[in-house]
């Protein structure tokens, strides 16, 4: 009936067709529509009347104005939802055609309205239905995020109303982690309305929890209008965050089964082309304006052939021509359903080889039943790539819970195979587990887990005795010159030794197996092996557990402690037990059984260390993976080598390398250790021959066997002494077995064990404390010596009065000194000097220069306050000095420095001349100590600034004095010769009169003996070098 009324209301043709435009606020729609009307021939000469809308419902008022005041023939615009539905109802009442750019469904608009926005939930549901039919999916699941809840529910309701064979097994909200069990056990084909973040989480859950994750197909419906490449790039980057490459590869394999379903109209390419063509800025507002242009273009295609715009009001004829037909618009293809709702176009993409591949188009088809409501067969799914065939089917042969497949026959076959292969499988499992343990390398220590002891450093520097470096170390090496250090590994203190690594180290399987065995060795008398750090820098670091009392060599020969029979028996038994455990293990031999490798913990338990590792290091050195240790010098052979078995000493002298240890060699060295514990003597200490001569005597087969001398009058039984001497036989096979040594030790000390374990511990502690008085006295003497060195160093850094106050514990209060003299020495062109030399040479040159300055200052009544870079500050008159003697002292020092610089040569470049500028000023300063942990003596005042100005404004090789200082010098000490320089501009002071100090009359009379002075200066330089070396050694 409405269409009949519209047919009756055909107005008389007028020359100007009026279009009423409800313009969105600040959208510039009018200009864009005028451009579109000019491009359309039938609209070019007609009037466009634009009134604002979408602001406090002014669009409703202006719609009425357009109808009643302007009598427009066509209404367009009103993009806001709150106005467009009401305008649609008004247009129906006025019998006007209304082109709306708002997203309206069939239920939300009237029959005279055409909804032009290509975003329709019903259309999206139609697209999903068409896709499922094309891919023969009969069961699906729908998952969505909280942000897409409205969209997902609307589409689900539309799909659920269809009388179709498409079944929705699951419809759940998830963040990628929750509700996943139900989802994974309900469907294999999933339609995703998740956010990109939730989708990435869901993929990780799918990878970890799904029984067969590669059976899942996921079609992700883009609700965020994101770029296609950005979507897949985000997923790929998310896979890159996996903890290992295998997990990342599994996740990327799952991404091959995800397809992105995207509205084609979300692509802004056509909008950008239009903006570029007409000089506009691409924006979403421009896109909405182009949607209105699509409506005008649609009507133009209908009216242009007829040449009469009034036929726009003939809606039945208009509807038949503009619906169910595809035309090209400004924003893309336009397809209006039979109810006046524009249907969207979709495209599908998949990810292959790092790029998005277009696999299908989904477009509307001509049908009398297609529109804004959910119908059937309104879309056709057009595949464009065979990649769609890679998506798995919608169901699994075994069902969603794997309940359709019977595993009975599988279990039967597995039981039979397991029964047949039980023993080989067990063996293979054992070997595999063993191999896995070897490849796991539990003995490897990461470099970042090692924290070196700041107070430890090189242990050789912590004692005065030269042998302490090996005695205090938890282990030693025969040929390595390295010194053990302390470090912290996993909150445990360890002893470490570094070896220079030349290139990447690759341990053989046999070596890794031995290191594993070392790592897992556990015995009371075996020091635990912490591990090795390698291929993480330029060093290989070997670590053993640290013991608090260091080694037996340290206790017996360095600390010179005397132990009774209880301690002796305990030490010997512990060593015997430890070596017995090593000989019965897969390591077999120790190879370096010295007292320095018998370390003692806080409970007086002896532990053997430094075994099983030297052969591996030697092999790595032969492969040039480690730098070789310092060459073995036969002429400077160490005393401890005399404790090796004769056959091993011969190998050392011949090959100059350490031989592999043997069980018989360990027996020989065990006897040497027992000898030293019993008699507190080093082997062959009574001999007069040199160590080299003793080594040749021991290795010689022609001479009589050479054994350590057993002291006479000892209290030990002949049984024990005899077994010790049998261990020293030259023939390895003739040496006694370890069990005989154990028996002799037990017989010797078995009667000494009396009382309970606590009684024995108390007795041992009493014996240990008996020698403490002598140790305390010795340590007191060492402390006094160290304090004397500290005092001398303190007097060099601070004035004597200040140093005495600090030593006595008094607080040093800042003081004001009314009359002192300062000398500032400035190295000329220091920047160019630094550019011409490498940093090491700069430091060496300045060290040599300033040491010479220090030597000159110390011979006068002055002291160096500080030197920073190229500045050197000297002060005289603190704390007190009668009269102006401090001025005379400073002048003498400056003249000596001037004379010294004439002969100073830069050692690394003798042709380079180094010059200094000096400035002298007398006056008042404030002096005091700054800092507590690292105190420094500092002076402040205008006198310091003036002295610096005198130095900076002077000439190279000259000594400049301020006017007041020069007048005082001429008055008090006329022997000094001054020359007036004149007025100069001094920063912060203005124009000042200054003088040059040119010499002293007494010194000038002695210039004839120039050569003798030069010799004296060279002597002083040598003394300065010696002082510097002594200072560094201290």
UniProtKB/Swiss-Prot annotation:
Residues 821-951 form the Guanylate cyclase domain. Pfam families: ANF_receptor, Guanylate_cyc, PK_Tyr_Ser-Thr. Residues 758-785 form a coiled coil. Its EC number is 4.6.1.2. It is a single-pass type I membrane protein. Residues 17-409 are extracellular. ATP binds at residues 470-478, 497. It is an enzyme of class 4 (lyase). Keywords: ATP-binding, Cell membrane, cGMP biosynthesis, Coiled coil, Glycoprotein, GTP-binding, Lyase, Membrane, Nucleotide-binding, Receptor, Signal, Transmembrane, Transmembrane helix. Residues 1-16 form the signal peptide. It catalyses: GTP = 3',5'-cyclic GMP + diphosphate. Expressed in AQR, PQR and URX sensory neurons. SUPFAM superfamilies: Nucleotide cyclase (SSF55073), Periplasmic binding protein-like I (SSF53822), Protein kinase-like (PK-like) (SSF56112). One of its GO terms (biological process) is intracellular signal transduction. The chain crosses the membrane at residues 410-430. GO terms for molecular function: ATP binding; GTP binding; guanylate cyclase activity; peptide receptor activity; protein kinase activity. GO terms for cellular component: plasma membrane. Glycans are attached at residues 28, 224, 301, 308, 373. It is found in: Cell membrane. It comes from the Eukaryota. The keyword Transit peptide does not apply. Residues 431-1034 are cytoplasmic. Guanylate cyclase involved in the production of the second messenger cGMP. Belongs to the adenylyl cyclase class-4/guanylyl cyclase family. The protein kinase domain is predicted to be catalytically inactive. This is Receptor-type guanylate cyclase gcy-25. It comes from Caenorhabditis elegans. The gene is gcy-25.
């Amino acid at each position: 009936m409405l269409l009949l009324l519209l047919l009756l209301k055909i107005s008389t043709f007028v020359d100007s067709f009026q279009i009423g435009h409800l313009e969105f606020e600040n959208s510039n729609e009018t200009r864009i529509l005028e451009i579109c009307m000019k491009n359309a021939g039938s609209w070019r000469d007609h009037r466009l009347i634009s009134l604002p809308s979408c602001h406090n419902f002014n669009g409703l008022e202006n719609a009425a104005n357009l109808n009643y005041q302007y009598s427009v023939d066509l209404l367009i615009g009103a993009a806001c939802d709150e106005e467009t539905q009401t305008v649609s109802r008004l247009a129906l009442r006025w019998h006007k055609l209304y082109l709306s750019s708002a997203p309206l469904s069939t239920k939300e608009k009237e029959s005279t309205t055409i909804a032009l926005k290509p975003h329709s939930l019903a259309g999206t549901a139609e697209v999903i239905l068409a896709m499922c039919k094309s891919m023969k999916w009969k069961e699906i699941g729908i998952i969505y995020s909280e942000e897409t809840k409205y969209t997902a529910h609307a589409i689900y309701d539309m799909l659920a109303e269809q009388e179709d064979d498409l079944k929705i097994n699951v419809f759940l909200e998830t963040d990628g982690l929750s509700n996943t069990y139900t989802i994974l056990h309900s469907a294999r084909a999933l339609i995703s309305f998740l956010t990109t973040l939730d989708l990435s989480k869901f993929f990780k859950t799918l990878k970890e929890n799904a029984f067969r994750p590669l059976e899942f197909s996921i079609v992700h419906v883009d609700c965020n209008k994101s770029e296609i490449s950005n979507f897949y790039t985000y997923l790929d980057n998310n896979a890159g965050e996996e903890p290992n490459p295998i997990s990342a590869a599994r996740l990327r394999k799952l991404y091959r089964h995800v397809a992105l379903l995207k509205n084609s109209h979300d692509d802004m390419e056509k909008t950008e082309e239009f903006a570029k063509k007409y000089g506009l800025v691409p924006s979403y507002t421009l896109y909405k304006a182009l949607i209105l242009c699509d409506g005008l273009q649609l009507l133009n295609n209908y009216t242009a052939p007829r040449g009469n715009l009034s036929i726009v009001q003939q809606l039945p004829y208009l509807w038949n021509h503009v619906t169910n037909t595809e035309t090209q618009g400004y924003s893309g293809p336009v397809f209006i359903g039979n109810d006046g709702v524009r249907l969207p176009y979709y495209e599908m993409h998949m990810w292959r080889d790092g790029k998005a591949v277009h696999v299908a188009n989904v477009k509307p088809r001509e049908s009398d039943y297609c529109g804004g409501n959910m119908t059937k067969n309104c879309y056709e799914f057009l595949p464009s790539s065979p990649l769609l065939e890679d998506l798995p089917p919608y169901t699994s042969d075994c069902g969603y819970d794997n309940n359709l497949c019977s595993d009975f026959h599988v279990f039967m076959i597995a039981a039979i195979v397991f029964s047949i292969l039980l023993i080989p499988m067990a063996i293979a499992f054992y070997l595999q587990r063993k191999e896995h343990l070897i490849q796991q390398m539990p003995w490897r220590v990461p470099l970042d887990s090692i924290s070196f002891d700041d107070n430890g450093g090189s242990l050789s520097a912590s004692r005065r005795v030269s042998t302490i470096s090996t005695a205090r170390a938890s282990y030693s090496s025969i040929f390595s010159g390295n010194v053990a250090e302390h470090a912290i590994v996993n909150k445990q203190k360890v002893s470490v030794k570094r070896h220079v690594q030349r290139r990447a180290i690759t341990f053989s399987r046999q070596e890794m197996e031995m290191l594993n065995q070392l790592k897992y060795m556990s015995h009371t008398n075996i020091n635990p092996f912490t591990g090795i750090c390698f291929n993480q820098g330029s060093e290989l670091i070997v670590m053993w557990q640290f013991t608090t009392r260091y080694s037996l060599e340290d206790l017996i020969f360095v600390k010179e402690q005397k132990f009774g029979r209880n301690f002796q028996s305990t030490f010997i038994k512990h060593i015997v037990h430890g070596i017995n455990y090593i000989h019965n293990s897969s390591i077999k031999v120790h190879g370096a059984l010295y007292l320095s490798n018998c370390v003692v913990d806080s409970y007086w338990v002896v532990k053997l260390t430094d075994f099983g590792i030297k052969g591996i290091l030697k092999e790595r050195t032969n492969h040039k993976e480690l730098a070789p240790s310092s060459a073995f010098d036969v002429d400077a052979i160490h005393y401890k080598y005399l404790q090796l078995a004769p056959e091993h000493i011969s190998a050392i002298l011949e090959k100059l390398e350490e031989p592999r240890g043997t069980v018989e060699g360990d027996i020989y060295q065990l006897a040497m250790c027992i000898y030293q514990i019993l008699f507190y003597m080093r082997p062959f200490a009574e001999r007069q021959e040199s160590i080299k001569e003793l080594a040749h005597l021991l290795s010689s087969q022609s001479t009589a066997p050479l054994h350590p001398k057993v002291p006479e009058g000892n209290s030990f039984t002949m049984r024990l002494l005899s077994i010790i001497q049998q261990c020293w036989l030259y023939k390895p096979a003739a040496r006694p077995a370890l069990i005989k040594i154990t028996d002799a030790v037990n017989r010797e000390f078995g009667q000494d064990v009396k009382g309970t374990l606590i009684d024995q511990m108390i007795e041992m502690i009493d014996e240990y404390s008996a020698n403490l008085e002598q140790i305390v006295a010795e340590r007191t003497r060492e402390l006094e010596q160290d304090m004397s060195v500290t005092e001398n160093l303190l007097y060099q850094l601070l004035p004597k009065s200040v140093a005495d106050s600090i030593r006595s514990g008094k607080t040093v209060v800042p003081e004001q000194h009314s009359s002192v003299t300062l000398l500032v020495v400035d190295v000329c062109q220091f920047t160019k000097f630094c550019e011409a030399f490498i940093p090491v040479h700069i430091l060496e040159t300045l060290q040599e220069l300033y040491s010479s300055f220090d030597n000159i200052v110390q011979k006068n009544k002055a002291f160096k306050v500080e030197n920073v870079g190229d500045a050197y500050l000297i002060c005289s008159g603190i704390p007190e000095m009668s009269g102006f003697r401090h001025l005379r002292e400073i002048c003498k020092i400056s003249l000596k420095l001037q004379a010294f610089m004439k002969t100073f040569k830069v050692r690394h470049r003798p042709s380079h001349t180094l010059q200094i500028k000096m400035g002298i000023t007398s006056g008042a300063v404030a002096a005091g100590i700054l800092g507590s942990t690292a105190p420094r003596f500092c002076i402040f005042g205008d006198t310091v600034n003036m002295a610096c100005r005198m130095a900076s404004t002077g000439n190279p090789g000259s000594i400049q004095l301020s006017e007041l200082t020069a007048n005082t010098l001429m008055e008090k000490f006329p022997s000094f010769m001054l020359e007036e320089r004149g007025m100069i501009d001094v920063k912060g002071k203005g124009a000042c009169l200054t003088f040059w100090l040119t010499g002293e009359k007494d010194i000038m009379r002695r210039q004839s003996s120039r050569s003798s002075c030069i010799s004296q200066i060279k002597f002083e330089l040598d003394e300065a070098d010696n002082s510097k070396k002594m200072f560094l050694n201290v």
